[in-house]
Each structure stands twice: as structure tokens, then as C-alpha cells.
């Protein structure tokens, strides 16, 4: 199966952490920043400046324009410190060749199960592995790591901070699920670095984005995590009204 591999990047021209670990991934950068990225040895795909602006817009541009005769597109954050799996109770970082094999085999699995989007766990906690259910089909898939088998679903550009929750729900609504590999997880520095979506992320905007997401899907599906010790938890809980795992 032919798969294209991309990492959108904005205002982070230093050598990409992701590309150091996984050199098969190409950074997708806007034209006005391209020279700075090239100076630091990044392998890039140049897109028009208008393709950037928020994380949903650039991902949609990739999905609309960069399949390059592939059956699927892999999109990962540009600051990924590694993709890990649990083997014999130990957390192991995948090398470049192992990740390529992992992506291809699970993309085939996803397609065979009738889904068009798959990803991995968003937390490293061993408790999230769930040995007896290593696969999920009704679970949230974070946008830092996702594979998209060609389809017509796109990210909501009005939800640039909650785009992955909405995107997951769109796939579940249309295809009755999407595949999550629970025994693997990604490690990224979300909201900790300059550039990316941190340029427009703040508490006020997070609350506004939550309200928009809840208005779109309803309060029975989108709820606040009341168990959180934070004054306001950025991450909503999604409750899927379907039976399954």
C-alpha cells in the first residue's frame, strides 16, 4: 500500500525533532518560511501561505492536495519525541523502519475493518493499554498521529483547538467507527513550544472552542471532565451513543 508521510510545521524552522527520528516524514511549510527551514536541513514540501493559519486548514490542504497517488496519508506533529509500543510489559520506542512497518500493517487492518481513519493512544500510561482490548473503534484519536485512507471527511476549520475530537466523531458518524491502536502511543510537547497551534491557544479560546464543539454535537456527547483537578480541563470527554469498544 502506498502511503505519503507529512508533518505540518509553522514557525519552527529548527531541525524537526520528528524528522531526526523518522526521516521519511516530510515537513509541510508555507512558502514565506521555506528558506529558514531549508537552511536547517529540513526536507520540506512548500505550500502557499494561505494553506496555513490554523491546524485544521493545513491538514485539509494536505488531504485535498498531497495524496500524490497514495491510498493513504500519514500526518504527524513536527515535534514528536517518539512513537512507543508496549512489548512484554515494557515501553519501547519504534525506530524508523519499525514505524514504517507499523503504519503500513495497521493501515491495511483499518481498511479491512471498513474504517478510513486510525491512530494511537494519546497517553503513555500502561493502564491505557488495556491488554484484553488492544484495539478500539469508538475512541478519540488525537491529531498528533493519524492515518487517513482516502475519503471526503475534512477537519472543521472553525474548531482549530478541538479539531481532532470533531474529526473522530465525523468518522464514527459516517463509518460507525475508526481504529485506535491502544498498545501504542505518541509523545509530543503539545502547547509547550513556540509555533504551531500554541500561537493562538489560551484559556479563553479553549473555552470558546469547547462551547462550539458541544453546540455542534450536543451535551450528551460532549461533556466536561468533572473529575479533573484543574479549574478548567482543556480536554472534553466524548460519549459515543453506540455499542462497541
Feature locations, PLM:
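Short, solvent-exposed loop/turn segments at secondary-structure junctions
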Residues: 10-12, 79-81, 123-126, 152, ...
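Short coil/turn segments at beta-strand junctions that form active-site/ligand-binding loops
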Residues: 1, 23, 42, 69-72, ...
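A structural signal for short, well-ordered beta-strand segments and their strand-loop junctions
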Residues: 72-77, 116-121, 178-182, 222-225
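Active-site-proximal specificity loops/subdomain of glycosyltransferases
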Residues: 29-76, 81-95
Amino acid at each position: 500500500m502506498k502511503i505519503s508521510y507529512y508533518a505540518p510545521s509553522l514557525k519552527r524552522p529548527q531541525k524537526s525533532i520528528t524528522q531526526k527520528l523518522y526521516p521519511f516524514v516530510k515537513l509541510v511549510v508555507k512558502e514565506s518560511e521555506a528558506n529558514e527551514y531549508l537552511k536547517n536541513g529540513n526536507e520540506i514540501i512548500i505550500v502557499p501561505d494561505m494553506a496555513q493559519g490554523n491546524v485544521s486548514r493545513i491538514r485539509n490542504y494536505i488531504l485535498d492536495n498531497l495524496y500524490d497517488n497514495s491510498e493513504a496519508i500519514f500526518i504527524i506533529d513536527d515535534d514528536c519525541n517518539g512513537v512507543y509500543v508496549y512489548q512484554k510489559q515494557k515501553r519501547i520506542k519504534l525506530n524508523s523502519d519499525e514505524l514504517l512497518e507499523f503504519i503500513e500493517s495497521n493501515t491495511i487492518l483499518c481498511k479491512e475493518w471498513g474504517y478510513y481513519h486510525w491512530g494511537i493512544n494519546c497517553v503513555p500510561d500502561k493502564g491505557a493499554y488495556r491488554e484484553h482490548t488492544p484495539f478500539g473503534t469508538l475512541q478519540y484519536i488525537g491529531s498528533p498521529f493519524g492515518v487517513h485512507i482516502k475519503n471526503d471527511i475534512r477537519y472543521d476549520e472553525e474548531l482549530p483547538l478541538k479539531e481532532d475530537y470533531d474529526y473522530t466523531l465525523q468518522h464514527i458518524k459516517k463509518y460507525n467507527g475508526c481504529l485506535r491502536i491502544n498498545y501504542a502511543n505518541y509523545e509530543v510537547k503539545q502547547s509547550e513550544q513556540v509555533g504551531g497551534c500554541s500561537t493562538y491557544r489560551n484559556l479563553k479560546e479553549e473555552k470558546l472552542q469547547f462551547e462550539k464543539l458541544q453546540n455542534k454535537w450536543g451535551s450528551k456527547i460532549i461533556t466536561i471532565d468533572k473529575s479533573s483537578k484543574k479549574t478548567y480541563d482543556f480536554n472534553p470527554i466524548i460519549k459515543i451513543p453506540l455499542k462497541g469498544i
